[in-house]
């Protein structure tokens, strides 16, 4: 979709401005719960229902932790002078 295409362009722009190590360091600095959910959702492309089952948490907790992880990463990007707002995917 058009929204997904725009999101990919924004994400690619962020990756071009930061090294892989900088991105890794930002993710590593997340609290462990947020980092785990972020990695499963964004890197492993798991659904919240799958994450909830795997981690023995509720889907609501999974969604909340992912949202909070993204907000913390956004703050880290802003601290580096990169404006980025992650759009919710449907």
Regions found by a protein language model. Give the residues of each.
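Internal acidic/polar
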Residues: 1-20, 47
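Helix-turn-helix DNA-binding motif, specifically the short coil turn and the N-cap/start of the second
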Residues: 47, 56-61
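Short amphipathic alpha-helical boundary/capping segments
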Residues: 22-31
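C-terminal edge and immediately downstream basic/flexible tail or linker adjoining helix-turn-helix-like DNA-binding
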Residues: 53-54, 70-90
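A short pre-motif secondary-structure segment
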Residues: 37-41
